[in-house]
């Protein structure tokens, strides 16, 4: 019997574009900062926390001396015990609330870079060393403010969670000083790119699922996974942000209350009885958009979108999906399963063959092995040359090398990277369409005395996994 915990109250939702593949101008016009569900909420039972919470005018009213934080050096793939507590002295002093410091004494405010229902985001520069940060200003009076600060403290230290550097408290608001992700938002990149190659999508998606899995292990449900809340660093790596709707959850508990963004919300949220698997559904919607360029569930109104989420059957066999590999479609089908108990977990997503095949580790292994072959071939040729010829060749080789002191973006190696991604995608689709008879399949999948080395599947646990996946 699962214990049920109600969410705070029906939260704000954002209106998202239905089609990510149309022109940039029309796509931009589809965005609105926030789309309120207050009218819709009146038709629903207004939910409140079952836990007794004192007045939220200041963090000083809460239990002093205790806060939450992750275990030091915890791996995202190793269970952490869900929500370990530590003394507040173990948390960075600058991120503790109730300090007397004034933000104007430490930072200079710059331009506004974002605005939402609960506050605004501005660039701020450190007076001490000139480093730029993002400052999120949140008005007091909403419990989401206190919860967001606590959860960011709880999750701090993970490389894919936006780092909280300092918290300043004033009479009417909190200032959260966080790392500045200069690469912008993932949604803006999606609008420009349209459809992503499977290789590129898989590497973005794996990083996202790693941080979602970490949140779930730490007893946190984000409840608002969408590309607007995924930021990019200068190197193109993702950072999960905006924990305003996030909730703490114990193992076996369920949540209630509407929260999230309409196009990404899981069907069980509409029934107001859900668990951390709502994040898996939302991530599945994002993966669908990355691979197809459009959102799966659309409508002219909230009710129409919700009706599509509850009833529309997704077709992964026609249109753009004919050029997408079967493993990718299989993963999507498992993530966008309406039956929550049948939906895979974040950890299972990370172990799916499609993720294992396309991630950096697998592809780097392919490159290293091919490089070793080419180096072996060139060394054989050098052995047959005179010492003078070897010296000339080595000098010429050194002169050809270009210094790589300029910063590179893993998502901006443009044509060459995209060409390689396209080749891999074509090969995967071709392999997926191969039909192997059962006798041949048993011979291919069964171990032999002289197994063939599979350079492209070093991340897979067995050859049988490869046969089932492709």
UniProtKB/Swiss-Prot annotation:
Key words of the record: ATP-binding, Kinase, Nucleotide-binding, Serine/threonine-protein kinase, Transferase
Domain Protein kinase per the UniProt entry, residue ranges: 107-355
A GO term, aspect molecular function: protein serine kinase activity
Enzyme Commission (EC) number: 2.7.11.-
Catalytic activity: L-seryl-[protein] + ATP = O-phospho-L-seryl-[protein] + ADP + H(+); L-threonyl-[protein] + ATP = O-phospho-L-threonyl-[protein] + ADP + H(+)
CDD domains, per database record: STKc_CAMK (cd05117)
Coiled-coil region list: none
Record-linked InterPro entries: CDPK_Ser/Thr_kinases (IPR050205), Kinase-like_dom_sf (IPR011009), Prot_kinase_dom (IPR000719), Protein_kinase_ATP_BS (IPR017441), Ser/Thr_kinase_AS (IPR008271)
A family per Pfam: Pkinase
Extent of Basic and acidic residues compositional bias: 387-403
Residues at the catalytic site: 224
Residues the entry annotates as binding ATP: 113-121, 136
PANTHER family the record matches: SERINE/THREONINE-PROTEIN KINASE
Protein name: Serine/threonine-protein kinase PEPKR2
Organism of origin: Arabidopsis thaliana
């Amino acid at each position: 019997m699962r214990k049920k915990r109600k969410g705070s109250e029906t939260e704000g939702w954002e209106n998202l574009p239905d089609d990510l593949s149309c022109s940039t101008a029309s796509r931009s016009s589809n965005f609105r900062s926030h789309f309120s569900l207050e009218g819709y909420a009146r038709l629903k039972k207004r939910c409140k926390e079952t836990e007794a919470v004192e007045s939220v005018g200041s963090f000083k009213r809460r239990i002093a001396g205790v806060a939450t934080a992750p275990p030091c050096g915890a791996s995202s793939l190793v269970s952490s015990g869900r929500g370990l507590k530590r003394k507040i002295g173990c948390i960075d002093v600058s991120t503790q609330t109730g300090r007397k410091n004034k933000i104007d004494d430490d930072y200079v405010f710059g331009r506004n870079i974002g605005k939402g229902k609960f506050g605004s985001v501005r660039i701020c520069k450190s007076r001490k060393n000139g480093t730029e940060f993002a400052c999120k200003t949140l008005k007091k009076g909403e419990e989401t403010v206190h919860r967001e600060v606590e959860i960011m403290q709880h999750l701090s230290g993970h490389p894919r969670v936006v780092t909280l550097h300092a918290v300043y408290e004033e009479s009417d608001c909190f200032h959260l000083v966080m790392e500045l992700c200069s690469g912008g938002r993932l949604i803006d990149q999606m609008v420009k790119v349209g459809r992503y190659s499977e290789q590129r999508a898989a590497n973005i998606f794996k990083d996202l699922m790693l941080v979602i899995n970490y949140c779930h292990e730490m007893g946190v449900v984000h409840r608002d996974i969408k590309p607007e809340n995924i930021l990019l660093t200068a190197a193109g790596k993702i950072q999960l942000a905006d924990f305003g709707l996030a909730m703490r959850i114990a193992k076996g508990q369920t949540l209630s209350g509407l929260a999230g963004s309409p196009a990404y919300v899981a069907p069980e949220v509409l029934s107001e009885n859900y668990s951390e698997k709502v994040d898996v559904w939302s991530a599945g919607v994002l993966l669908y958009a990355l691979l197809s360029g459009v959102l799966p569930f659309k409508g002219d109104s909230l009710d129409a979108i919700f009706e599509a989420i509850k009833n529309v059957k997704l077709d992964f066999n026609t249109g753009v999906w004919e050029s997408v590999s079967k493993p990718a479609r299989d993963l999507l089908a498992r993530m966008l399963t309406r039956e929550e108990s049948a939906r895979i977990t974040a950890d299972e997503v990370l172990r799916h063959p499609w993720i294992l095949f396309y991630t950096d580790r697998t592809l780097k292994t392919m490159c290293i092995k091919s490089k070793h072959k080419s180096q072996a071939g060139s060394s054989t040729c050098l052995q047959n040359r005179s010492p003078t010829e070897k010296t000339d060749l080595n000098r010429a080789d050194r002169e050809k090398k270009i210094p790589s002191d300029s910063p590179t973006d893993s998502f901006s190696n443009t044509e060459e990277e995209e060409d390689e991604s396209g080749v891999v995608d074509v090969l995967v689709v071709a392999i997926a369409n191969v039909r192997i008879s059962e006798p041949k399949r048993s011979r291919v999948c069964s171990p032999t005395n002289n197994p063939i080395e599979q350079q492209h599947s070093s991340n897979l646990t067995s050859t049988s996994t490869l046969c089932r996946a492709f």
